[in-house]
Amino acid sequence: MLLTLYLSYFLSKTKIYYEKGIYKIEGSISVLSKKYLVISNENNNILIYTSDLKNSTPLSLGDQVEIQGELNPIEIDNSKIATFYLQNNINYLLKKTVILTVIKPEFSVKEKIMNYSKNHGELFDSYWRLLVFGSYDSKELVLNKVNRLNIVHLIVISGLHFDLLFYLILLILKPLDKIKIKSKYVAFALIFYYLTLLANPVSALRAYIMQVVKNSNNPFSYNNKFKKYDGLLISILVLFLLKNNYLFSLSFILSFSSTFTIMLLVPMVKSKKLNNFLKTLILMTLIYLFNIPMLLYINEYWNYFGLLLGIIMAPLFQFFHLCSLLFWWSPTMLSWMYYLLDNLLYYLVEYTFALKINISINWWILIFWSSFWYLTIFFMKLKSNIKIWKIKTA
């Protein structure tokens, strides 16, 4: 993983470079929000703040544009800005920007989804698009609430969402097996198409690849099975090959580090003589503690009830995610559900205490914290193995 991170950083520097000045640039819109957009041009991504943009034509993802403005090399003020630039592969900031021409695609599924969502009110649009596709226009309605509750990682599309979705689709398609059509292949095809519609597919793609590996045969193994960590390693390699800058995204780091830690901890927790509920509770607590620095890096708030809220809200968000997918054709019902969820989040924010953290969390703190956990787990496993070896040789 360290090698792929280094290669990603190296490749991000092998670009076509421009000197500071006024340029006309052609490219496509790869990222779009209310505050900024990103233009892809000759393997360079160019950031434009919408407050600095002169344009009368509504813009959409995928639009081909010709723009003119003052091109400036990026300036990095802090680690969060650096992370944003790296994960989006941004090399330049364009100021005093004028859009000269806009060419829209003849048909866009994402545009149809956007219009459908916006046509059913602000509440539906804010929750439905966020829960189903991980996209949003404003943080005000939803994300600010979950940030203060330390549960923002639960509402966005994650690997767990995809695992549940895969098994649900597999259950629905099970009758296909009777007519000699492999239901799992149809399920993988449907989920792959869904993947292409996500605003940030990193975590979901990780889960998808791991499921594919889990349900495939390994031609290089004597028993045709992949080893425990093969799926995780293959997913890292695939993401690197698809887009090397994925490896700098917070989604990648949070998803892969959490998954790897869970895979290390599960055998240790399972070995304890406890019931399944307590084992699950212990595992969730350990993962929450492991992710504390990353959550503070993302949220800037510390909620004293964050662990309890995470345990309670995780299954609730899973339920809302599946309902949003299955009942997309009933915006009235979903709007009513979102109204209840929004009120629940409002009261949780009002009656739980969140402290704003002024400590600057940088990548060295995250690396040190992760290393401490992994070394601790390694020595605990080593101690356990030595104990087992002594018993066997006694």
Region annotations inferred by a language model:
Residues 2-153:
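Membrane-interface helix/helix-cap signal primarily in integral membrane proteins
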Residues 2-5, 263, 292-293, 319-323, ...:
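Alpha-helical transmembrane segments
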Residues 4-17, 31-34, 333-394:
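C-terminal regulatory/interaction regions
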Residues 69, 131, 158, 199, ...:
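Divalent metal-coordination and catalytic microenvironments
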Residues 98, 321-328, 377-382:
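Cytosol/matrix-facing ends of alpha-helical transmembrane segments
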Residues 105-120, 124-127, 131, 135, ...:
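Hydrophobic alpha-helical segments of integral membrane proteins
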Residues 144-307, 365-394:
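Hydrophobic alpha-helical transmembrane segments in multi-pass membrane proteins
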